[in-house]
Design a protein with these regions (language model features):
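Ubiquitin system architectures
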Residues: 1-88
Length: 88
């Protein structure tokens, strides 16, 4: 099933959809296609908790019942700047 996500970083907001069975790493690849930053320079968060690249979106709590087109799941995005990641 599809999940719908709002990915936010500062003033940038991306609306994306993915399969509930997609991994967090696969979501990072989608973001890479849009923002041109590789997955290793990205960190994704849900409710201020860092998401594990190997987990599926469903395992992270983004289910088709929760992340709807009219009420998408919110994902925080941080980029690596120099040696550290920026705050969300």
């Amino acid at each position: 099933m599809d999940v719908f996500l709002l990915i936010r970083r500062g003033k940038t907001t991306i609306f994306a959809d993915a399969k509930e069975s997609s991994t967090v790493f696969e979501l990072k690849r989608i973001i890479q296609g849009i923002l041109k930053r590789p997955p290793d320079e990205q960190q994704l968060y849900k409710d201020d908790h860092l998401l594990d690249d190997s987990k599926t979106l469903g395992e992270c709590g983004f289910t088709s019942q929760m992340a709807l087109p009219q009420a998408p799941g919110i994902v925080g995005l941080a980029f690596r700047e120099d040696e550290a990641f920026e705050d969300v």
